[in-house]
């Protein structure tokens, strides 16, 4: 998972995509005329103000029920009736908070991806300076979140699964921007003393490799109950490490004898 993304194969690590990450959700400012909000400078539709006025416990309970439903059934197969029942709220109240199921889905997905983003940002501070080790450790860091949060992990994976659906197209559009910032942060403070040639071109080669590597890896997995994220981590890191060794040593064995 270290550098590219599962969100509609947008590019870089396995599931979440640090090369194409979400464009924010930090500050929420309500408009007085409707319930539109500004998120990091962009207009997004968020839940009605009444939802934010609920107790934190109730909001968490509703979100948890929605995560469970979306992760198990996906967007298309999910039932708002089951969400309402599992959240313990009155029928119809859910749509006092959200205009429709799609708005609810993206709000929940935003929350989950924001949680992953903050986890990666915090963990990235302790990554090694050596470039190739840093990429591998970042992969392990991201997988560790999925292992701890399998339900949320399935939700993120499922968001990218239906590549031809209108919702997945919106997922890709929503989360593909501003990824370069995350990629740049991954390369901050690295030890470049051992790199040869143009450093920017080296970074570009790594980015292209990670995008292709992750897209290929992602085609071989699918969201399902009881996903073995530990096994996926082992396979991913082992394969990534093998390719990192090839990149470090080069693909030529030496000059041919004449």
Regions flagged by a language model, labelled:
Residues 61, 69-103, 107:
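Helix-turn-helix
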Residues 146-167, 215-226:
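Amphipathic alpha-helical segments used for helix-helix packing
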Residues 114-117, 121, 125, 129, ...:
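Amphipathic alpha-helical packing segments from all-alpha helical-bundle domains
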Residues 72-76, 127, 149:
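Short coil/turn segments at alpha/beta junctions that flank glycine-rich nucleotide-binding fingerprints
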Residues 65-69, 145:
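Short amphipathic alpha-helical elements of helix-turn-helix/winged-helix folds
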Residues 6-45, 184-188, 212-258:
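C-terminal peripheral helix-coil segments that are non-catalytic and often amphipathic
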